[in-house]
């Protein structure tokens, strides 16, 4: 029975998502060691845990009422608290622990407030270490309850929650009685944390914790107790499995080895009942391989079913690069064409891929299907005469062209209307969304709106409900947000567990890594998803470290200093001229975008010499080279060309250009004289014709929006106009411009909420070569969105300024030509006012002008050392354009002529138009005319450069990357250019990495992924070291959490979790603080000088980009500090049992996995009724004496063999078997009798402290004893004689040799909400959904959800008594059979 008032607290906590049952789990390290008799310890936990705004400095001892059984011992407390300690704990379980809740009223010296403490009693161990002498104080006499003690229920009745929180403690709390626990030599007592530490630990805990259903009892750790970390499930041995179609036996084998993730391979797809119409010739000649035919068949089969809302079901192809998605799609279109569905739509990311689409259709024997480009049609009916009367075939379009619109009006003035008319209302043909993850975000993050492209894709599907939709994306089901417009998969919506897409996203993202695996498996199970990847067997890679020369480091550090000065000047100038908020936002957006690109260019430039060297060597060895770049730096070249009047005297420094362009265009200092002379205005002449209405304009004439010259702007717009769509400069790792047609509207809509570095097209002025999208691409519809301008006399100067976006109606800089409402009613200023304002603003502007000039002068000095454009330098060093095939988005290049002069030339050739230049260059490379190819990321999507059996050039490809993306998925996508099906030889990959921040780490993460896919490293130099480096990927919640701790510790908001790098010369925190101020991640308050963190301070991407702007030794030390903190965060999470390991692997190591029971349940589904199975699995992980002696017999090292612990506990010793695995570092592998092979390696020095070497006979008794008892006795009971958890009737599995798991498999998605309901009701809302992969002894693979033991019976009841769902499933099955009479024979085994 809940006492009155308790419901207040419970409600408050449940709102915070905290389960009262689990509020204060005590970690093993936190409990003090107590007296030899089993006492109960009182522990108070600080209120800051509840994030209720109060702070505390120590735990508070509380008097307790006498108990019949045990004697209390108090926890050691060093100092009285400064604030209320208020602990809510296990209200409904307290009586079972024999505890009493008391409130002490202490006579206060300075205050009349009450002290409230709610405590929890914890029983601790009965055994002290033998080395500790018996304590002098055996027991502290418990005080009888005094008059001052008040029961909690009375307290809760009389106070509101708010009042309880305000109560202050008295100043004079007595020191607690000392016990053996105060003996520091014990090593088990944790030091009191400071209030900041406690707050941090609790806040992080709340973020990460998974609440367990049962009360956790503390494990008291002794100093020398061997750590038995239960990490057995961490083995991720086999991630990928060989793939062959299971249910379909037609077609020839695929030319290359293909793999599938092992979780997907554990699921079998549905039976095939659909018969394809594709000709025997196509199949027998292998034009479509067996696995491509399988995808075509399943897609066609899925298209025969309808979702509950009446739409036709869609199919998702998740094949990776090189498996032949193009041919599979062509096969689906061909299949439907043969069935008289002769119209199809194919959307992709680049117009160049149209040629690939034509090739794929031709290759499978569908020569008669024509492919038309949407952008080549005029607006109007596609089937009309002026569009060539196109009645059938495939219309190929890019996503961005979907939102195209004609200014001339008419019935079909948008591309979408054209397509809808061409298809017709009853359209049941194929719509393919290729690379659909690139179609801009429909499900935006934060405050931004969905993009027009995303909405158009959705509208197209909604308007054509009978269309056969195919989604194709290599990252299809790995990123749930990318699935926003895959509404035809039937995962969310009517008749599914998730009503809306947002419900699905919440459920999946809340459940972590494994949830998407469950979704993918469920989709494969239902026949709507297929995902294979090319095996990387045969591929080799090496990591080539490029050492930075002293002169390079010097130059880099100079550049860093210049950027720090630039940041200060930009800030000062903006303050001087009182820049408007919107202008500042735009300015900083541009500043950080330029900052990121500048340092990326410097990083790449450091590797050019080495690349050239390696490339020449490989060519000599008879191989050919592909060099991958992210960006081309074209915009910089064009600017330099214009400044030199079309003449160049040297290669252009891209890095210099970035900073120069930033200062010239975006420094807040208008060049007034130039502007007015250009407009023909005499500043000194008084304006005669200005009416009172216009007088405010006088002072404003002087102001303009940004310091650009209007004519130069217009001139440049004309000049650069043709380059708008090019992917030239900003295909950087976070750029939005993935598409060949940059979708300005969409990009402006994207994440408008904040100025992060990643979107160069965000702010009012666009990037680089698109100086102003409005000037280049006049888009009349956009002007409708702008606020209505106040009518202005067209002859006035102001209107000229406004028209060119340079005027403003306010005496401050406006970043956009929008007039604020305030200016409409502004009173006319008097002349004197106007003049004085003119003088001060002129003075400020002149000072800003001077700053701008100084910055440009400093840049010129530095420019002598800055490296030239990487791409031009590479081409020049490797023999010029005649030897190098360039596949990038740029239109021209800088070349050195025979006479040594430098000139700019267009890339286009006489007989080759610019549009197909890249395809021509690719052909030259594939034909062997050129043996070196340089590709930029944007231009290369979909281009195949492998050593194809059909190509003339069959030399082995060596693919070099100068810039690794820090996401392994993106890297694998890049490598898909040279590693594809039907190749003679697999490529070699070379990662060039410098010693700049974290490049080594990126490389090792990518290397680890490649190894998982079957690639080999050159030599074994990396075998041990880099595995440690890549052990934890950092773009996850632990990475963000570690970064938060790092940043807070640097500004003293938090105490550091790890010590700074020992080899750092100087004061680490002080230097790094200055460095981070310089890159804008720490802000300094103007007046107070207080340091504050940037609002995105825990954004990993931003952090990694920004720290490149710190001096070399600083950024490396900071990255090392971050990596160390991350390791500590992960270790802590593991120790507290809250580490989200993603997917657990059982049975891939030495464990023996057996199925002991299985229960099946029918579940409803829209196409077929599915079923779920609940397996009872027993896992045996120990090592018998026979197995141990077998390993022992093979050991050769001097220190290998059996060891016994020096310490005796409960009259027992620990026996272990030790094997040396790394002689250089003296690392040893340990085997234990109860838990088998340990994942954690031990250093020899640590081993010697705890163990001594013995002969095998001495170890035998101890080994057998622990092996036999661990079958059913946990570690605590074995070493201490009792286990507190077991004594409370709870299950304890720590150290058990045999464990039991309950795993729910099958169509889990259809019962997801039921499972969540049961888990939440038993275990609280934040229970972690743990996915497990099992491989049983008989070779069966099982992947599913672990169900906690205490949730099994309610779940079984729910699933089995759900008669309604079973009946519904049977009805659906019958209905389905009526729709598909031809398939009844095939359904008997469904």
Swiss-Prot record:
Any Pfam family hit: AAA_34
Compositional bias (Basic and acidic residues): 695-714
Start and end residues of each stretch annotated as Disordered: 21-43, 685-846, 872-891
Any single Gene Ontology cellular-component annotation: nucleus
Cell compartment(s), UniProt: Nucleus
A single GO BP: negative regulation of MAPK cascade
Ranges of Basic residues composition bias in the record: 778-790
UniProt note on tissues of expression: Highly expressed in brain and testis. Expressed in the hippocampus, olfactory bulb, and cerebellum. Low expression detected in lung, heart, liver, skin, colon and kidney.
Chief place where the protein resides: nucleus
Chain intervals with Low complexity compositional bias: 726-736, 814-837
Record key words, sorted: Acetylation, Coiled coil, Inflammatory response, Nucleus, Phosphoprotein, Wnt signaling pathway
Modified residues (Phosphoserine): 146, 160, 212, 690-691, 695, 751-752, 765, 791, 812, 1383
Coiled coil location: 840-867
Record's miscellaneous remark: Expression is down-regulated in Reln-null embryos. Expression in P19 cell line was up-regulated by treatment with Reln.
Role summary: Plays a crucial role in the regulation of neural stem cells (NSCs) proliferation. Enhances the phosphorylation of GSK3B through the PI3K-Akt signaling pathway, thereby upregulating the Wnt/beta-catenin signaling pathway and promoting the proliferation of NSCs. Improves ischemic stroke recovery while inhibiting neuroinflammation through small extracellular vesicles (sEVs)-mediated mechanism. Enhances the secretion of sEVs from NSCs, which in turn inhibit both the MAPK and NF-kappaB pathways in microglia.
The family this protein is said to belong to: Belongs to the SBNO family.
Name of this chain's protein: Protein strawberry notch homolog 1
Gene expressing this chain: Sbno1
């Amino acid at each position: 029975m809940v006492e009155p008032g308790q419901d207040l607290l419970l409600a408050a906590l449940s709102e915070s998502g905290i389960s009262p049952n689990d509020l204060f789990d005590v970690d093993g390290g936190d409990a003090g060691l107590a007296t030899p008799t089993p006492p109960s310890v009182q522990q108070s936990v600080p209120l800051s845990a509840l994030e209720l705004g109060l702070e505390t400095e120590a735990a508070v001892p509380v008097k307790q009422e006498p108990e019949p059984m045990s004697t209390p011992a108090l926890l050691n407390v060093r100092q009285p608290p400064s604030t209320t300690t208020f602990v809510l704990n296990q209200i409904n379980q307290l009586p079972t622990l024999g505890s009493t809740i008391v409130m002490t009223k202490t006579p206060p010296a300075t205050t009349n407030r009450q002290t409230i403490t709610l405590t929890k009693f914890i029983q601790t161990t009965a055994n002290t270490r033998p080395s500790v002498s018996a304590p002098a104080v055996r027991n502290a006499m418990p005080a009888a309850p005094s008059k001052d003690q008040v029961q909690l229920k009375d307290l809760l009745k009389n106070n509101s929650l708010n009042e309880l929180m305000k109560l202050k403690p008295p100043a004079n709390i007595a020191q607690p009685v000392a016990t053996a626990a105060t003996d520091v030599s014990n090593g088990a007592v944790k030091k009191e944390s400071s209030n900041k530490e406690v707050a941090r630990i609790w806040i992080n805990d709340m973020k990460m914790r998974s609440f367990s259903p049962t009360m956790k009892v503390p494990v008291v750790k002794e100093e020398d107790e061997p750590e038995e970390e239960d990490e057995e499930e961490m083995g991720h041995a086999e991630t990928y499995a060989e793939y062959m179609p299971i249910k379909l036996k037609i077609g020839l084998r695929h030319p290359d080895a293909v793999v599938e993730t092992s979780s997907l391979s554990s699921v079998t797809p549905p039976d095939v009942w659909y018969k394809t119409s594709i000709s025997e010739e196509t199949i027998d000649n292998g034009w479509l391989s067996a696995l491509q035919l399988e995808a075509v068949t399943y897609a066609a089969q899925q298209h025969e079913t309808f979702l509950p809302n009446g739409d036709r079901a869609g199919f998702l192809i998740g094949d990776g690069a090189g498996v032949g998605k193009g041919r599979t799609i062509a096969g689906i279109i061909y299949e439907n064409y043969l069935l008289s569905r002769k119209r199809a739509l194919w959307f992709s990311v680049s117009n160049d891929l149209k040629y690939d689409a034509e090739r794929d259709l031709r290759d499978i024997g569908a020569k008669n299907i024509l492919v038309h480009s949407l952008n080549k049609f005029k607006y109007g009916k596609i089937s009309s005469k002026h569009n060539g009367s196109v009645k059938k075939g495939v219309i190929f379009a890019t996503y961005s062209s979907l939102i195209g619109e004609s200014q001339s009006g008419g019935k079909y003035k948008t591309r979408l209307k054209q397509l809808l008319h061409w298809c017709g209302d009853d359209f049941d043909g194929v719509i393919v969304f290729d690379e659909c993850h690139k179609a801009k975000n429909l499900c935006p993050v934060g405050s931004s709106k969905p993009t027009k492209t995303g909405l158009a894709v959705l509208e197209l599907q909604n308007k054509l409900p009978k269309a056969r939709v195919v989604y194709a994306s290599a990252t299809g089901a790995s990123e749930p947000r990318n699935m926003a417009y895959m509404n035809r998969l039937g995962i969310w919506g009517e008749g599914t567990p998730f009503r809306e897409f947002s419900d699905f996203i919440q459920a999946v993202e809340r459940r972590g890594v494994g949830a998407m695996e469950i979704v993918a498996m469920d989709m494969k199970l239902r026949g709507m998803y297929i995902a294979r990847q090319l095996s990387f067997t045969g591929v080799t890679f090496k990591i080539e470290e490029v050492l930075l020369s002293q002169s390079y480091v010097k130059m880099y550090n100079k550049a860093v200093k210049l950027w720090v000065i630039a940041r200060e000047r930009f800030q000062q100038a903006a303050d001087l001229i009182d820049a408007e908020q919107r202008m500042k936002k735009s300015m900083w957006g541009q500043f950080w975008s330029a900052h990121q690109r500048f340092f990326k260019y410097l990083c790449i430039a450091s590797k050019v010499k080495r690349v050239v060297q390696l490339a020449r060597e490989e060519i000599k060895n008879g191989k050919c080279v592909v060099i991958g770049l992210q960006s081309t730096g074209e915009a910089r070249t064009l600017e330099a060309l214009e400044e030199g009047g079309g003449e160049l005297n040297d290669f252009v420094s891209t890095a210099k250009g970035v900073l120069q362009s930033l200062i010239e265009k975006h420094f807040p200092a208008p060049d007034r004289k130039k502007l007015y002379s250009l407009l023909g205005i005499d500043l000194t002449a008084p304006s005669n014709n200005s009416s009172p209405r216009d007088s405010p304009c006088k002072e404003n004439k002087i102001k303009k929006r940004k310091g650009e010259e209007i004519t130069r702007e217009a001139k440049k717009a004309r000049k650069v106009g043709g380059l708008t769509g090019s992917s030239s400069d900003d295909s950087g790792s976070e750029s939005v411009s993935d598409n060949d047609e940059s979708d300005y509207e969409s990009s402006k809509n994207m994440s408008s909420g904040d100025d992060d570095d990643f979107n160069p097209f965000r702010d009012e002025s666009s990037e680089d070569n698109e100086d102003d999208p409005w000037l280049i691409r006049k888009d009349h519809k956009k002007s409708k969105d702008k606020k209505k301008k106040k009518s202005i006399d067209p002859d006035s100067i102001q209107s000229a300024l406004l028209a060119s976006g340079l005027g403003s109606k306010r005496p401050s800089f406006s970043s956009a030509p929008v007039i604020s409402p305030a200016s409409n009613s502004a009173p006319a200023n008097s002349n004197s006012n106007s003049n004085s304002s003119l003088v001060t603003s002129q003075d400020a502007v002149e000072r800003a002008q001077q700053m701008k000039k100084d910055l440009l002068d400093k840049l010129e000095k530095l420019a002598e050392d800055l490296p030239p454009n990487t791409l031009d330098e590479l081409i020049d060093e490797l023999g010029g354009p005649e030897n190098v095939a360039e596949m990038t988005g740029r239109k021209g290049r800088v070349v050195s002529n025979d006479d040594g002069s430098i000139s700019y030339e267009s890339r286009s050739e006489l007989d080759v138009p610019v549009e197909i230049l890249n395809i021509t260059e690719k052909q030259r490379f594939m034909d062997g005319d050129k043996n070196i190819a340089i590709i930029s990321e944007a231009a290369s999507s979909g281009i195949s450069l492998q050593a194809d059996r059909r190509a003339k050039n069959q030399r082995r490809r060596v693919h070099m990357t100068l810039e690794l993306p820090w996401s392994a998925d993106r890297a694998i996508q890049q490598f898909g250019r040279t590693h594809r099906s039907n190749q003679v030889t697999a490529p070699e990959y070379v990662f060039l990495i410098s010693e700049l921040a974290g490049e080594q780490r990126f490389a090792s993460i990518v290397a680890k992924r490649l190894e998982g896919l079957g690639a080999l490293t050159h030599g074994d130099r990396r075998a041990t070291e880099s595995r440690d480096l890549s052990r934890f990927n950092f773009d996850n919640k632990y990475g963000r959490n570690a970064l938060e701790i790092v940043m807070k510790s640097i500004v003293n908001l938090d105490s550091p979790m790890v010590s700074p790098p020992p080899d750092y010369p100087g004061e680490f925190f002080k230097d790094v603080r200055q460095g981070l101020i310089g890159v804008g991640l720490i802000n300094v308050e103007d007046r107070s000088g207080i340091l504050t963190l940037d609002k995105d301070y825990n954004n990993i991407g931003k952090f990694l980009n920004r720290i490149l702007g710190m001096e070399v030794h600083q950024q490396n030390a900071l990255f090392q500090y971050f990596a160390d903190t991350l390791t500590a965060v992960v270790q802590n999470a593991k120790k507290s049992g809250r580490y989200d390991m993603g997917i657990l692997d059982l049975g891939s190591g030495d464990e023996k996995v057996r199925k002991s029971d299985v229960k099946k349940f029918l579940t409803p589904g829209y196409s077929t009724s599915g079923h779920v199975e609940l397996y009872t699995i027993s896992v045996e992980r120990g090592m018998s004496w026979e197995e141990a002696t077998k390993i022992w017999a093979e050991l050769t090292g001097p220190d290998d063999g059996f060891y016994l612990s020096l310490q005796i506990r409960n009259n027992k010793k620990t026996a272990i078997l030790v094997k040396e695995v790394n002689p250089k570092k003296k690392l040893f592998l340990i085997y234990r009798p109860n838990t088998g092979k340990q994942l954690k390696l031990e250093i020899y020095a640590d081993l010697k402290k705890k163990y001594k070497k013995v002969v095998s006979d001495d170890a035998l008794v101890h080994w057998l004893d622990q092996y036999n008892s661990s079958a059913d006795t946990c570690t605590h009971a074995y070493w201490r004689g009792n286990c507190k958890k077991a004594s409370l009737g709870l299950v304890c599995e720590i150290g058990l040799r045999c464990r039991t798991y309950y795993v729910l498999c099958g169509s889990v998605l259809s019962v997801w909400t039921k499972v969540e309901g049961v888990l939440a009701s038993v275990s609280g809302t934040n229970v972690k959904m743990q996915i497990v992969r099992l491989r049983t002894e008989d070779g069966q693979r099982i992947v599913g959800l672990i169900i906690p033991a205490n949730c099994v019976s309610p779940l079984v009841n729910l699933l089995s008594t759900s008669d309604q769902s079973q009946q519904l499933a049977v009805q659906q099955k019958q209905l389905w059979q009526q729709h598909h009479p031809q398939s009844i024979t095939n359904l008997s085994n469904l």
